């Protein structure tokens, strides 16, 4: 028979272990694992969500949709939310990596509140992905363009007069000494060469890959990069580069916040008619462990005021009409004004400049416009894994 004292010790240890396991379980239940792009969320909003729901949000970063896919497919980490672009949502769905969204848990979501461009992108996605609306919630959207140094004499004229692409790849059309950068994501790089040839980036064959490779090998780029390209142009180390329009705007906002007047900004962006249009979306992986918390986070981020505040930091355009209207009409979130838009930090012209930027670079289509957004949405239709491998190896 066990000694009573020893028995009590055993019971105490068992109780202690149970408590530790219970606490650990609670902690795990309150941690949201988010896979996101770099510099792509308002961190003040994340902290606010953590406080409101007594949880923690752990953010991992990947630099491309392809990395998103490999991380979700591997299942090494059970992410609760991911923010891939349209074509990658389709691929993840086709591979059985996503679970449907429970829209009954998203009272802040109203499909009628989507901007015309966002609606059109979903409609285009549905041509090859019928269940798109059931698996994604729009996060941010935009285009790609050619950011350039306004102080480089003759550069702006050359870009505009040649619809961007001819000047971008034929450097004889550029002012002497122009330093050009290329966005280092194979799918996007391939698309630029197809736009240059007036071909669709969604057609991939051995012949088009050969054409793309020939163009790239015959074009001298001073730098290949991603997020750093915008900073290189702003600092004068590059003159021209292909990038997200949102990256350009992010750098613009930084300059404005640092006290530079809008008319004194040294760079601008040209958005060709034939370019990439995209929409990044909140999706829930099939292996997510904190599905209810993921829905709470989605609902929190798409709230009108929060979508507005998120767009103010990352530079990309909100897909929600009500939030967009707040921006272009200079409205503020009154109770959060001092937290997010301290006048001493941002300057008195911040809201006016933000409104100008949205209307200039993300203009709403007119009711009579047949095309609701500028650009081409990338698709996975007719593109095999071997094609994607060839594109990757080409770069």
Predicted regions and their residues:
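N-terminal secretory signal peptides that target proteins for export/translocation
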Residues: 1-5
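Structural recognition of the beta-strand scaffold that forms the well-ordered cores
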Residues: 33-36, 58-61, 80-83, 138, ...
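Early extracytoplasmic/lumenal segment of secretory-pathway proteins
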Residues: 26-95, 231
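Sec-dependent N-terminal signal peptides of Gram-positive bacterial secreted proteins and lipoproteins
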Residues: 6-27
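Loop/turn elements at helix/coil->beta-strand transitions in domains of secreted/extracellular proteins
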Residues: 53-55, 77-80, 175-180, 236-239, ...
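Mature extracytoplasmic/periplasmic domains
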Residues: 280-359, 363-371, 376-377
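Extracytoplasmic ligand-binding site segments that recognize negatively charged/polar headgroups
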Residues: 85-87, 91-237, 251
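Extracytoplasmic/periplasmic substrate-binding proteins
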Residues: 207, 221-287, 321-329
